[in-house]
């Protein structure tokens, strides 16, 4: 009808510096020393992403990140031939982790608001991947360290774990 009032707003926010989330992850694994097969039994993640705007989405971000980290620690690897051509270029050759290989993750959120923005929020998506990889890797090393194993190349496939155990025993 032409008598309406238009309401428009515009705002730019530029943070004076980036925010930094903090956290820690603990993985519990079982390693079959006869086969090298590793099973992730438990994974606990405590993350401080400041004020969570949507805790359900934050949980999903952390769960997805942990799954990526576990996959990188246990199975993901790009392999090239002698000419530099990828040999793991599709899902038939490149292993992808699924929920069948993963336990239910235990997520704990801390909330230390940042002063950098008015919401007090920090990033949350990367924390699962960043904490997931070393927690799983070092849980495996810890599980076989009594056998003399000090290092295993990633990914820590059953073959690599078994080879490291065999080398330490000889």
State each model region's role.
Residues 1-170:
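C-terminal catalytic domains of large/alpha subunits in multi-subunit enzymes
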């Amino acid at each position: 009808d032409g008598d309406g009032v238009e309401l428009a707003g515009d705002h730019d926010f530029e943070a004076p510096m980036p925010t930094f989330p903090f956290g820690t992850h603990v993985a519990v694994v079982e390693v079959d020393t006869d086969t090298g097969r590793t099973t992730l039994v438990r994974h606990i993640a405590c993350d401080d992403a400041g004020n969570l705007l949507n805790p359900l989405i934050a949980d999903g971000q952390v769960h997805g990140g942990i799954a990526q980290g576990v996959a990188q620690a246990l199975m993901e690897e790009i392999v090239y031939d002698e000419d530099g051509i990828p040999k793991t270029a599709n899902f038939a050759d490149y292993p992808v982790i699924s929920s069948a290989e993963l336990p239910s993750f235990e997520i704990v959120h801390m909330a230390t608001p940042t002063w950098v923005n008015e919401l007090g929020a920090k990033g949350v998506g990367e924390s699962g991947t960043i904490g997931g990889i070393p927690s799983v890797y070092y849980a495996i090393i810890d599980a076989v360290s009594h056998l003399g194993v000090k290092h295993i190349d990633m990914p820590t496939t059953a073959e690599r774990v078994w080879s490291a155990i065999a080398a330490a025993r000889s």
